Amino acid sequence: MTLTSPPRTRADSRHSWVPAAAGWTVGVIATLSLIASVSPLVRWIIRVPREFVNDYIFNFPDTSFAWAFVLALLAGALAARKRIAWWILLLYMVAAVGWNVADLLTGDESVVEEMGEVIGLAFHLAAVAFLLLARPLFWARVRRGALFKAAGVLAAGMAVGVLVGWGLLELFPGDLERDYRLAYAANRVFAFAGVDPDAFDGQHPHVVVNALLGLFGALALMAAAIVLFQSQRSENALTGEDESAIRGLLELYGKNDSLGYFATRRDKSVVFAPNGRAAITYRVEVGVCLASGDPVGDPKAWPQAIDAWLALCGTYGWAPGVMGASVGGAEAFRAAGLSAIQLGDEAILHPDSFRLSGPDMRAVRQAVTRARRAGVTVRIRRHRELSPEQMAEVIAHADAWRDTETERGFSMALGRLGDPADSDCLLVEAVQGETGGERSDPGSGTVVAMLSLVPWGSNGASLDVMRRSPQSPNGTIELMVSELCMQAEDIGVTRISLNFAMFRSAFEQGAQLGAGPVARLWRWLLVFFSRWWQLETLYRSNMKYQPQWVPRYACYEDARLIPRVGVASVIAEGFLVLPFSRRNKQHTGHHTSAPQDLVASGVLHHDGTAPDMSGLRTDTADDEPPRLPEQVRVRMAKLKALQADGVDAYPVGRPPSHTAAAAVDSPDDVELDVAGRVLRIRDYGGVLFAQLRDWSGEVQLLLDNSTLEQGSTADFTAAIDLGDLIEATGTMGYSKNGTRSLLVRHWRLTGKCLRPLPDKWKGLTDQEARVRARYVDLAVNTEARDLIRARSGVLHAIRDTLYHKGFLEVETPILQQIHGGANARPFLTHINAYDLDLYLRIAPELYLKRLCVGGVERVFELGRAFRNEGVDFSHNPEFTLLEAYQAHADYHVWIDGCRELIQNAAMAANGEHVFLRPRDDGVLEPVDISGPWTVKTVHDAVSEALGEHIDAATELPTLRKLADAAGIPYLTHWDEGAVVLEMYEHLVEDRTEKPTFYKDFPTSVSPLTRPHRSIAGVAERWDLVAWGVELGTAYSELTDPVEQRRRLQAQSLLAAGGDPEAMELDEDFLQAMEYAMPPTGGLGMGVDRVVMLITGRSIRETLPFPLARPR
């Protein structure tokens, strides 16, 4: 995936071509000079134009490695728009103008020579003019470096080169006069053959000698350049204060960045956002400023850090590039004008879901088994747990087992081991023949492999070093990774970042069946280069652990710079090692990049350890407080004022002596105290009235300055807002208008309400707001409290009724391996401890029947069930379900039993046997439900609705014809029972009002019900329906295990065929049934729907906290 953005450029100019043209021109001369110094053929081919250029335009000796090297550096600097290169070229051109003018003024030149001088003068004047006009385009500076040290190396190198060259000329002088040999050597070594050879008497020395003299100068220049470039990196590397600031940012914001800790690698440089809350670490290679990973720090400050980094790139003429950015980081760089391309994927393991079981982990499982059989055990320690001697041994192993001369890595490697600042790093060792068994016990075995992982936030680890001895058994690495995941909980690790797999998608796509020729060719190339760079090996070593793949991106400014950024990345990561690169050298910079105010605060440490976090939070992480409504801000200010005065706004509670309702009925001379929420306040100066509500009711408080023992009513007004919780103590009495009131002597605040209550008269009028803020609805709305009481009364009445009949209440599992007991779509979840998919139960039926088999003759469960179905006024995904089973009974027994349960519940909630039903005007009116209820068969009820007689023997074509006539849809694969059930639901259930029992359902739609004892084709089952809502169902339970198995197998076939509501085959339940269950009548009742009809409200209104769609 590639994210592109418009390229960032400075203001365009008519002379923008000058830097590139100057660089190319000088570069061509440098290239030709180098080739001519090596090849006599090329030197002969370009002799004539070279001599013209050398005489009149630009110094171009026949052989000079030194001059070629100088010009190469100058060409690169000009192309990079370095200001110092502009000055050098300008001064050279100005000097050349002077030389040409001087030669013309002497007047002793031939006509041809004068023409050459004029051409050269014109070229130099034009070059000076264009360079002056293009001066603003050469803005780039040069980084600080050890300039004097480099100059000393250059001087010493040149001196040695001149002396060696002088000696060489003494040995092979040709016809060169002795007096000129030293000067000739100096001209060739450090004057770049700038003096005309004709100035020296005698014939020139052999061309090989000239080439060697130029090579001596080139070597001196190279040595000086190497010293300068290396000093630039070391001078500008991280200082202790920089590293300390980075560690502080990582502690504050680094919990999501698996590569964040690698920002402390000490051969990197750093640039901070101006506010110090974010930073970017980078390294400069081949003119590319290569940032490693995401910015470190507050994501809100990433744009400022990126802007500072890009400004730095512009200052020094570097091309910006990024290696290993995450999706969020790539988006941030893209917003700053860079483009991004997916580089590969990082392998993330989650130990809580890591298992060696399963076919996908077979290879790892077998490798682990082999390693264990070889006697390998794993030891895991923090670096701080190792003694200096033990750490020295670890470092020795890491160096000895490294398969390259230098350590690789840049964006995903730390580059050091054993530093005291890295004490939180993890060390995982594979030990062969170890006798110790503890995690941190050094044991007595031989270490054969090791992993070192750096911290990833507070609960993660990111792989830094992986080493194994050539003598380690096969499977050692797999064993270490597996044991790390298995023991992760003990060491506080919840996520592990393994190696980075570059071009992972290319390997996968190229290996797929039907991959195109381009994909296969690209994969072949990657496999070919993997012989040296281990691309495929890293991919396969990660893939076998079944990790989560997290994409990482490379960012660049312009598509033309992709090859250059790629080369810089290859050099930085260590795949291409340049001479004298000193990758293993630890740097400590000399110029702190952290903001000066942060350095001056004193929180940073010189040794690079994490800073004082309290000071760092104050200085760098002071986020703006969230914007709050005005009333909330006022209340917050009042809370702070109270706390400043020593008032505890949230004290420890103490039970009040009376409820509000009891206080109203108490005698006047009894001192009492009440507690509740203030709903209204009326202030009349020295007298104040407040309405206090608790769960029992309301009481009016009367505060009078003359009766208050301490403080005044003004103190109450200043401290208390509507909604606050208070305690008040006093005696009962009457106000002047005769209202029964608590005459308050003293009071205290027990809970400050920081958000205003809704309108004191209307309350919460929006139904959605009432659902989402039920706590507020309960605080201000007596109707909401009545519904809570009614629901509690219904549950209590159901339990009491069953208890009095001798039923035993039990609890069965909510998490179930097989969904059964009803035809419904289940919720699926997963248990990490057993790596097992589970269902939230749709019904407790199958477990309750197991209890019946065990001899529990009267049993019930009143609890929660879950069905992943629609939500409406009568359906909720999570609901309360009653299931009860009575041995030696049938479904007829439960007709009276169910009616009694509901009537008792109605009595508990409403005080009489009534349902509340809304009239046309919305007012609820009671509907009597006392006495017996109507009982009908399903076929009789459908016949009444159709006007045509049907029964269990009616054939399918006839039923379809009747359904078509009634406009009832059906599916072609349905049998007779399913068609009858569909007509029943549309024509009977939806139109039923008074509570009615519909019995004897078709057998095919009742898989857990026994067949009717006398009527073929129907089952002993009834449904209770009232006002279009199914309230309950009861069965004469199927106890025949053979028939039960046949029906459940049919259901399992439907489930295998894609029916999400069909029950799965529960073999354990079937085995239980084979031990024989007594004849049993079972009842299932939806308690939420019963409460709904008793109270006249929807299910959402009767539930304290119904499921609400996210805002």
Swiss-Prot record:
Record field: catalytic activity: tRNA(Lys) + L-lysine + ATP = L-lysyl-tRNA(Lys) + AMP + diphosphate; L-lysyl-tRNA(Lys) + a 1,2-diacyl-sn-glycero-3-phospho-(1'-sn-glycerol) = a 1,2-diacyl-sn-glycero-3-phospho-1'-(3'-O-L-lysyl)-sn-glycerol + tRNA(Lys)
A molecular-function term among this protein's GO annotations: lysine-tRNA ligase activity
Region annotation Lysine--tRNA ligase: where it falls in the sequence: 613-1111
Stretches that traverse the bilayer: 18-38, 60-80, 84-104, 118-138, 152-172, 209-229, 308-328
UniProt keyword terms in alphabetical order: Aminoacyl-tRNA synthetase, Antibiotic resistance, ATP-binding, Cell membrane, DNA-binding, Ligase, Lipid metabolism, Magnesium, Membrane, Metal-binding, Multifunctional enzyme, Nucleotide-binding, Transferase, Transmembrane, Transmembrane helix
Cofactor binding: number and manner: Binds 3 Mg(2+) ions per subunit.
Phosphatidylglycerol lysyltransferase: region residues: 1-612
InterPro entries according to UniProt: Aa-tRNA-synt_II, aa-tRNA-synth_II, aa-tRNA-synth_II/BPL/LPL, LPG_synthase_C, Lys-tRNA-ligase_II, Lys-tRNA-ligase_II_N, Lys-tRNA-synth_II_C, NA-bd_OB-fold
GO cellular component: cytosol; plasma membrane
CDD domains to which the protein is assigned, alphabetical: LysRS_N
Residues involved in Mg(2+) 1 binding: 1023, 1030
Topology of this chain in the membrane: Multi-pass membrane protein
Keyword Nucleus among record annotations: no
EC id: 6.1.1.6, 2.3.2.3
Domain of life: Bacteria
Binding annotation for Mg(2+) 2: 1030
DNA-binding region: 674-747
UniProt key word Nucleotide-binding: yes
Family the UniProt entry places it in: In the N-terminal section; belongs to the LPG synthetase family.
Record-linked NCBIfam families: lysS_bact (TIGR00499), PRK00484.1 (NF001756), PRK02983.1 (NF002821)
Function: Catalyzes the production of L-lysyl-tRNA(Lys)transfer and the transfer of a lysyl group from L-lysyl-tRNA(Lys) to membrane-bound phosphatidylglycerol (PG), which produces lysylphosphatidylglycerol (LPG), one of the components of the bacterial membrane with a positive net charge. LPG synthesis contributes to the resistance to cationic antimicrobial peptides (CAMPs) and likely protects M.tuberculosis against the CAMPs produced by competiting microorganisms (bacteriocins).
HAMAP family (alphabetical): Lys_tRNA_synth_class2
Protein name stated in the entry: Lysylphosphatidylglycerol biosynthesis bifunctional protein LysX
Organism of this sequence: Mycobacterium sp. (strain JLS)
UniProt gene name: lysX
